[in-house]
Amino acid sequence: MSAVAGALRELLVRYLDAWTPVALHSARGATFAYGWSDSPDEHAAEAAVRVFAEFADRLRGRRLTVVLVGPAPATLARRLDTVQAELRTPPELSVHAVEGDLDARLPAALKAAGAAVAPLLAFLDSAGPASLAAAGTGKPAEVLLVSGTGQLPTPPMPLTAHVELVGGDGAARLVTFATTVGKGLEAFKNALWAVDEYAGVRYRDPRDPEGHLLDISLSPHPGPLRRELLAHLASAGPRTVTDLRQFTLTHTVYRAADTVRVLSALLTAGTVTRDPERGRLGGDVVIALS
């Protein structure tokens, strides 16, 4: 297992820990889809089922459907059957495998699972536009897409975040998270920065022209966010703290909560000003370049 793959699996698990209890509040149940274009990461799929098993008490009267789509899914399906038998998962947690090309088969597989009327999270590896469109049919809909670096994918959801995971050898994978709900994006960012360090794996913002590498930390280095906030203020003019928190959440790899920490340092340095000049740095405070 490569260090980047290990970090990706932990990111998935940490996000599922947040997504699953919320999704299971839906009276219509929920769907988790795992799709791949080449070969599946069996460890990641097993880890997902183990997370779901931890919430077995919340499955009474609700369903959680796991849909596997891609070439040669039989071995993975058998492995997950074994895991379910080991954990004695309830019948409300079901696994369905569909063999074939991901983009060709995922739309029909999700329709058959009733994914369009309930929470849907799709974990996709190297998926194309058809798969992303299908993943956008849930209510709410979320996708965690892993792909090669380069052109940024454009899922149909309105809230999107991109981050590259870079190994010590320079090998990198692009992770794109997209959702229809703001709380989902916040939960993803929290999971992103809570991942344990993996043998030199670091993050990189694909939209950062300087390509700075960031150590994974609950208190990430603020330098790139500082530059991005200053550039945004220079181009957009004065903005409220709420506006800047939203910018951080949707246009950087950082969490919204990191915004206030950076703004406080900029105010102390005299780089920016605030209106009103005193008091708590609340959401309605207006920030401008000095």
Predicted regions and their residues:
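S-adenosyl-L-methionine
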Residues: M1-G61, A77-A118, T242, V253-V272, P276-V285, ...
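Conserved proline-anchored active-site loop of SAM-dependent methyltransferases
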Residues: A30-A45, G70, A116-S131, A178
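Class I S-adenosyl-L-methionine
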Residues: P107-L120, S126-P276, R280-L289
